[in-house]
Amino acid sequence: MYFDAAAFCGHWPYYRVRNGKLEQMLEHYRAAGIESGFMSSLDAAFYQDPWEADQELVAQLAGTNWRVAMSVNPTMPWAEQLLLQGKEAGVGAVRLYPCLHGYGEDDPRVVKLCQLAGKLELPVIVTARMEDSRMCYLYVPRNPDMGRICNLARQCEDTRFLLSNCLATEVKALLPLPENLWLDTAGLRVDGFFENQQDIPPERFLFGSFAPLQCIRSSMCLLPENQKQQLMWENAQTFFEK
């Protein structure tokens, strides 16, 4: 059984995605041998009240090995209450979208929310980007600041962080990597990257497909065969044990 740390379902407002409905996504994941992971609602990322979409997703995933990575905008006045509500409902993680919502990773409200997530034992997923910036002619995404992301992790040392969909060219800016920061493989699918890079040990990466905005099968194809089990399952177990 494999684990996907960056799974999505729902509607992407800027173009139509194939097989974005939850039932379709779960079917495709099963066909790829992926039976568990963090599932995020694309709809929630754009709702004024993201819990309207996330609450529905929690109910739909009940009884499965999938957990919801809920959307929270730390700049909203009800962000902390929303986080407590999600914890009570059984979500598995918090996904932040500074790339969409326009706040800096060093915003005091972000730090405060992430510290609360640590107390609640909820991992925080920081989304570096949703898609290639060259495709973003309908909106202007905020580019990630790797230095600020590292500082955020250091300020919230009791919180586990997962950086999602960063680029291979951005990895060096994360060094030295904070002990509580992991990366998913979305955006890093450069042929030979995991075999050739020496800066971050392979146990600090979790598999992330970023489907349906990216392809599940191609996400798996460039993973080294001798590290696939580690990246797609074993590292997730270590991540949860921390």
Which stretches of residues belong to each language-model region?
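Mid-to-C-terminal alpha-helical segments outside catalytic/metal-binding sites
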Residues: 1-9, 13-36, 84-85, 202-204, ...
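Hydrophobic faces of well-ordered beta-strands that scaffold small-molecule active sites
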Residues: 3-7, 37-40, 66-70, 92-96, ...
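Active-site environment of divalent metal-dependent phosphoester hydrolases
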Residues: 10-12, 44-47, 75-78, 101, ...
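Surface-exposed cleft-lining segments at the edges of enzyme active sites
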Residues: 11-14, 42-46, 92-105, 130-140, ...
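Active-site gating/metal-coordination segments in enzymes
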Residues: 35, 48-126, 130-131
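Distinct, well-ordered alpha-helical segments
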Residues: 50-55, 78-87, 106-107, 135-155, ...
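H/E-rich (His + Asp/Glu) clusters that bind or coordinate divalent metals
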Residues: 160-242
